């Protein structure tokens, strides 16, 4: 059941997104009853200024859903409409709308004066009988009840209210009962210390090998295009050669969780194949287009793997997946943006629910957001997941924000989401160019025996020789590494911060203590100076001496529209012999 206001259902684009989900496999609910509290006014805006359609419920025509327009003063008609709507929903598993046409007796809130903006309307409302009296008069006129019965009902109801009020005054504090309490009984409320503790995400090598065989074996009795055959078979080769790439990290993370009995749900635009053609979680049979999900073939007792290409929506789909994660703490619920830049279409969900829902309503949530991020010359709308905005929302213990640079770390951070004794939203800035980068591979033992590393030291740097200590995150590390090697700079150490929040402060302090001889400490980022993680890092490096920034200069847009200019900017940042900011 979804309750709307008349102004909102007509004016909010989210409504259209949700209505379009009604019959889609990944999002349908078996029918939704939409109840519109239609008071013919939106705060101070008249309905004639609030929509172009005749009815506020005309959005229901998109799915040919029935709409019941009912007079809110007619109690029996309202009950009849609600019963009919529910019967329709249960019988046909489709949406139905109830347009409950009434009025708002007072202002938008207790202190509001509605006669400022609708004097004529409120003159009529002030003279209008309320629904209780209208219905009472009807029942009395039909000799069904008498006045004494009405007075008795009113007295009992007022006594009940007074009793509840007195009980509430005796309580020292108000306790919020968590939504879906039973599903969340065995989960802890994690503070920062617990969030920084190592979670055991190891997984037996033999089982990893079994999963690799499953995801690299196509049914022999079906035809597939040559490219997909080659791609799927390469997964086993990769495992045997002990060089696992990003796609394998994802598949093995999902497969290992499924084998342990957890469910996995992935949703978003083009997620079945992956925007950058790396995932191929759904394989299409060439002749029939039958869909094959190899991750559902791991074992008879495994969890269920669900993956859905979403409609072209961010706000509605992120909202749906947030709700799904709220109801399913034992499911890895993943929403992936087509490009990280597009997640701003869901900004309301991120601001009001994902970043602050647990703090406001005591409702934990383990949703994962994967945001492809990185500067490869694709322009302002295809380069940045707006890292700075997510980090600005971080406080105390509200969520994880990460920017992984190795497949193994991606494997472990996904497993950590369900292996931890708590649930927190996880924002991961994922790579694009690293998906097939020859240096971006991990060994099988990094998966089977390792754990998530929030901080990765430079294992090739000689601390005694190091003069410049560079902190960096994500994909940009490989650009700096290439520049360091080309320039033969053995006096530079590159340290990767893989988890941006909560920040591994103790680990960073150990790194600073280790490199005692440095006189140049750098935070390096490929984003402009007014974006990226710089603002977040300033809060934590403000007391560090000899600290500076290497970045692109401040821009209004996240990236340049020219690939050539973007590459030149990168060279200026990554080569210390040139200006570190342009």
Regions found by a protein language model. Give the residues of each.
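Short acidic (Asp/Glu) and glycine-rich catalytic loops that position anionic groups and cofactors
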Residues: 35-39, 59-66, 109-118, 130-142, ...
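Thiamine diphosphate
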Residues: 1-43, 47-58, 67-93, 244, ...
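Single conserved hydrophobic/aromatic residue that forms the stacking wall/gate
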Residues: 571-582
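ASCE RecA-like P-loop NTPase motor cores
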Residues: 220, 257-258, 264, 272, ...
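Hard-cation-handling environments
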Residues: 131, 142, 147-264
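Acidic beta-strand-to-loop metal/phosphate-binding motif
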Residues: 100, 518-527
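Glycine-rich ThDP/TPP pyrophosphate-binding loop and its adjacent helix/strand module
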Residues: 1-169, 341, 376-378, 396-513
């Amino acid at each position: 059941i979804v309750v709307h206001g008349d102004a909102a259902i007509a004016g909010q684009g989210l409504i259209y997104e949700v209505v379009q989900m009604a019959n889609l496999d990944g999002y349908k609910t078996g029918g939704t009853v939409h109840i519109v509290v239609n008071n013919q006014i939106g705060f101070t805006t008249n309905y004639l200024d609030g929509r172009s359609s005749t009815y506020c419920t005309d959005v229901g025509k998109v799915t040919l859903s029935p709409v019941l327009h009912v007079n809110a003063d007619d109690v029996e008609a309202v009950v009849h409409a609600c019963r009919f709507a529910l019967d329709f929903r249960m019988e046909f598993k489709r949406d139905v709308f109830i347009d409950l046409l009434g009025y708002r007796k007072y202002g938008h809130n207790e202190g509001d004066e509605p006669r400022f903006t609708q004097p004529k309307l409120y003159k009529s409302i002030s003279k209008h009988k309320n629904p209780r009296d209208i219905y009472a008069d009807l029942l009395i006129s039909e000799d069904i009840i008498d006045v004494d019965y009405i007075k008795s009902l009113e007295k009992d109801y007022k006594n009940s209210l007074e009793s509840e009020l007195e009980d509430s005054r005796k309580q020292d504090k108000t306790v919020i009962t968590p939504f879906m309490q039973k599903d969340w009984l065995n989960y802890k409320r994690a503070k920062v210390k617990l969030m920084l503790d190592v979670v055991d995400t190891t997984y037996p090598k033999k089982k990893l090998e079994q999963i690799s065989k499953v995801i690299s074996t196509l049914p022999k009795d079906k035809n597939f295009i040559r490219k997909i055959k080659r791609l799927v078979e390469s997964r086993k080769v990769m495992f045997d050669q002990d060089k696992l790439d990003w796609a394998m990290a994802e598949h093995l993370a999902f497969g290992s969780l499924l084998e342990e009995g957890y469910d996995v749900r992935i949703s978003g635009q083009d997620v079945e194949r992956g925007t950058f053609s790396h995932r191929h979680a759904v394989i299409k049979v060439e002749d029939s287009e039958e869909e094959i999900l190899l991750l559902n073939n791991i074992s008879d007792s495994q969890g269920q793997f669900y993956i859905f290409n979403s409609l072209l929506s961010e706000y509605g789909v992120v909202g749906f997946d947030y709700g799904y994660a709220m109801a399913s703490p034992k499911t890895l619920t993943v929403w992936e943006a087509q490009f990280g830049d597009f997640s701003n279409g869901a900004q309301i969900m991120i601001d009001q629910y994902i970043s602050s829902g647990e703090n406001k309503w005591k409702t934990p949530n383990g949703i994962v957001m994967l945001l492809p991020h990185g500067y490869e010359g694709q322009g302002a709308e295809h380069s940045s997941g707006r890292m700075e905005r997510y980090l600005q929302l971080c406080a105390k213990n509200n969520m994880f924000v990460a920017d992984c640079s190795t497949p193994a770390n991606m494997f472990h951070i996904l497993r950590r989401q369900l292996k931890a004794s708590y649930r927190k939203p996880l924002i991961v800035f994922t790579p694009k160019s690293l998906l097939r980068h020859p240096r971006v591979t991990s060994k099988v033992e990094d998966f089977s025996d390792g754990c998530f590393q929030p901080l990765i030291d430079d294992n090739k740097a000689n601390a005694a020789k190091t003069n410049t200590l560079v902190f960096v995150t994500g994909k940009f590390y490989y650009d700096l590494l290439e520049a360091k090697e080309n320039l033969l700079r053995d006096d530079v150490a590159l340290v990767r911060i893989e988890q941006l929040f909560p920040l591994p402060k103790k680990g960073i302090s150990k790194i600073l203590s280790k490199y005692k001889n440095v006189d140049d400490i750098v935070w390096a980022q490929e984003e402009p100076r007014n974006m990226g993680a710089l603002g977040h890092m300033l809060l934590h490096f403000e007391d560090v001496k000899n600290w500076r920034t290497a970045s692109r200069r401040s821009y209004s847009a996240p990236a340049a529209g020219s690939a050539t200019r973007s590459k030149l900017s990168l060279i200026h940042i990554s080569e210390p012999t040139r200006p570190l900011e342009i």
